Amino acid sequence: HSSWYNRLFSNSGTICYVGLVWVLALGAILPNLFVGSLRCDPRIFSCTFAQYVSSYYTIAVVIFHFFLPIGVVSYCYLRIWVLVLNIRHRVKPDRHLHHQTWPYNIHGFITMFVVFVLFAVCWGPLNIIGLTVAIYPPLGDSIPQWLFVASYF
């Protein structure tokens, strides 16, 4: 385990990871320039992704930028939770040891879970509205402006 860790998280590996993050960030934003989906939206007073430019592109953005991360993280959390439950039922630690280690072990898991829930709550409304309008464009006029604006904030 330690040899893999030392290889993956070396100085050169870290530089590669930072470079990969920048390449992925540019790869995520460049299609907007070709589709022409960056527009000034007077409802939110900002230059943002215009969901009405291309239905297919909006569907792809919602799938790759929202549902795919939600699906992957949900799968990982399910696997982690099953593993934690299986280990907890297999090993019966001493009560004193249990009280010392359990809060520290579960604290990191709960913190990551809260971050995941916040991601879903913050980005969910905007992406669900965008996906709904992309699938059925006439519905876009019936969405109240306050709901659209609230989904951005």
Swiss-Prot record:
Membrane-topology descriptor: Multi-pass membrane protein
Residue numbers on the Cytoplasmic membrane side: 1-12, 79-112
UniProt GO BP: G protein-coupled receptor signaling pathway
PROSITE patterns xrefs: G_PROTEIN_RECEP_F1_2 (PS50262)
UniProt keyword annotation of Membrane present: yes
Molecular function as annotated in GO: G protein-coupled receptor activity; melatonin receptor activity
Cystine residue pairs: none
One term under GO cellular component: plasma membrane
Residue intervals on the Extracellular side: 34-57, 134-145
Annotated TM spans: 13-33, 58-78, 113-133, 146-153
Keywords: Cell membrane, G-protein coupled receptor, Membrane, Receptor, Transducer, Transmembrane, Transmembrane helix
InterPro entries on file: GPCR_Rhodpsn, GPCR_Rhodpsn_7TM, Melatonin_rcpt
Compartments in which it is found: Cell membrane
Family per record: Belongs to the G-protein coupled receptor 1 family.
Biological role stated in the UniProt entry: High affinity receptor for melatonin. The activity of this receptor is mediated by pertussis toxin sensitive G proteins that inhibits adenylate cyclase activity.
Protein name (database record): Melatonin receptor type 1A X2.0
Organism for this UniProt entry: Xenopus laevis (African clawed frog)
